[in-house]
Amino acid sequence: MHLSEITHPNQLHGLSVAQLEQIGHQIREKHLQTVAATGGHLGPGLGVVELTLALYQTLDLDRDKVVWDVGHQAYPHKLLTGRYHNFHTLRQKDGIAGYLKRTENRFDHFGAGHASTSISAALGMALARDAQGEDYRCVAVIGDGSLTGGMALEAINHAGHLPKTRLLVVLNDNDMSISPNVGALSRYLNKIRVSEPMQLLTDGLTQGMQQIPFVGGAITQGFEPVKEGMKRLSYSKIGAVFEELGFTYMGPVDGHNLEELIATFREAHKHTGPVLVHVATTKGKGYPYAEEDQVGYHAQNPFDLATGKAKPASKPKPPSHSKVFGQTLTTLAKSDRRIVGITAAMATGTGLDILQKALPKQYIDVGIAEQHAVVLAAGMACDGMRPVVAIYSTFLQRAFDQVIHDVCIQKLPVFFCLDRAGIVGADGPTHQGMYDIAYLRLIPNMVLMAPKDEAELQRMLVTGIEYDGPIAMRFPRGNGIGVPLPEEGWESLPIGKAEQLRQGDDLLMLAYGSMVYPALQTAELLNEHGISATVINARFAKPLDEELIVPLARQIGKVVTFEEGCLPGGFGSAIMESLQAHDLQVPVLPIGVPDLLVEHASPDESKQELGLTPRQMADRILEKFGSRQRIGAASA
């Protein structure tokens, strides 16, 4: 059987180990070819090929349900559930999503994108099953990185108190999340992994007995119960934490040995209560470049399979916002020992790996624990430090209560630096940074700012570190504009003060962050049609520069706002609230992301679909304020 013939995972039933190994080879081949062409997560999926095949051979997927944590390791799952022939559309607009979506396939039982949710979801399904008198298996597959998240531990704590609830947790332990794992739990799991001498001892004894002339086979057969007893004794000791929490612990199992995996899963299915099977895997298995550099090959842009190197850009690009952030913060930290960078398992993605290498004592990785990261920062701020929490916009959502309760109510000087703010592209709705302006703007004592380019990002970093209270800066994914970057001597910005970039009499355009340059381009297009616009770089969404904005709005009488975020509660809402508070009844056109989920596509495709290109925005402005001539029509 070829992988291309598999449309249902139950087709794996009855296949030999040799046949499964052949399909595993085909999965890796398709996985590598596709990600090399489209980009996507590479290492996670390569590491769970055998785990997926063995698990699915022992389940009835017409009835049983598997929940994959995060979902970026579920590419083999997608290939085994009828998506082989359109797998080339992975992460492309209108194609297969990079994560799991309930609307995409009937075997995607729970959508995700953020970590540590799988055990809670699978336990919920198990309890629903029992409440309705049904009988099927519920399985959560979770990585050791995700297991550091508090929600996963909360779910384990709950499940362990339900001895009659049948639940299987498969711990995919590759000693990595995106970067190497941190913390006591990770250290404990690593001790379990290195306890493999027990496995080696029993296997060695078996091989030795087989070589005894005449009686070796019989002795070996008789030794099997002893061998299993030795293993169980070892397991009960090394898995003590999980046993004490109410789980039957099995493992560690070689995650690339199909025979051992199948036997272990079949044994696990016999238990009636919660079971944890500990599977030791290698991230990036089967592709040497990914095995050697597990951080770099966690996820990749399109690359050359033969060399493992990214396909060269057509022309040199400016440094990314993340890199500018990391380099600038490191320079500032060298002269200010109060500065400490905090990440929740995203050092490389946020640029904090630069600080980690240069000043390791001023760097903290808390693991996948956003709530802890925020309160840790609050505690450090209480005692004179200047913590900088570097985090993706989408992940700060997970610590919303802590931002309010532990930082803002106490007005502590914690600096939130929100990478990937706005449209992020192929990762889709779970990763879009759409909501931070709205959900942070409503919190008293919080200051919000966003740079128009990478040079202003440097100045805002100085501003945030100097400010004596809660403050947040958002900046987008990807490369900067390409403006000159001074290496030192950055000046802070006055809090709540905007910048006028262009003078005009017909229209007031107020832009925030990454939308400043598109607003300037829009103004140029409007100017060609006889409309002159004043363009303001707001810099701050809270507090607004009302001393500048309100008189201009009163004078010009027509206002357009620009933001790369959700319109409900966002920057445009802040402007309209301000004008209303000053009794100004002027027409306002807010431009941004409407009340919808932005699906996976390239950032440019998403902006086109949302009407956020300069030409589209100019057309909307002309339509709003009475002109019948459209920019697009005029340029056609």
From Swiss-Prot:
Any one of the GO CC terms: cytosol
EC nos: 2.2.1.7
Pathway: Metabolic intermediate biosynthesis; 1-deoxy-D-xylulose 5-phosphate biosynthesis; 1-deoxy-D-xylulose 5-phosphate from D-glyceraldehyde 3-phosphate and pyruvate: step 1/1
Top EC class for this record: transferase
A Pfam family of this chain: DXP_synthase_N
Molecular function in Gene Ontology: 1-deoxy-D-xylulose-5-phosphate synthase activity; magnesium ion binding; thiamine pyrophosphate binding
Cofactor requirement: Mg(2+); thiamine diphosphate
Keywords: Isoprene biosynthesis, Magnesium, Metal-binding, Thiamine biosynthesis, Thiamine pyrophosphate, Transferase
Amino acids binding Mg(2+): 144, 174
Domain of life: Bacteria
Catalytic activity: D-glyceraldehyde 3-phosphate + pyruvate + H(+) = 1-deoxy-D-xylulose 5-phosphate + CO2
Chain positions recorded as thiamine diphosphate binding sites: 72, 113-115, 145-146, 174, 287, 370
Record keyword Lyase present: no
Free-text cofactor note: Binds 1 Mg(2+) ion per subunit.
SMART domains: Transket_pyr
A biological process from GO: 1-deoxy-D-xylulose 5-phosphate biosynthetic process
Stored InterPro entries: Dxylulose-5-P_synthase, THDP-binding, Transketo_C/PFOR_II, Transketolase-like_Pyr-bd, Transketolase_BS, Transketolase_C, Transketolase_CS
Subunit structure: Homodimer.
Family of this protein: Belongs to the transketolase family. DXPS subfamily.
Function field: Catalyzes the acyloin condensation reaction between C atoms 2 and 3 of pyruvate and glyceraldehyde 3-phosphate to yield 1-deoxy-D-xylulose-5-phosphate (DXP).
Protein name per UniProt: 1-deoxy-D-xylulose-5-phosphate synthase
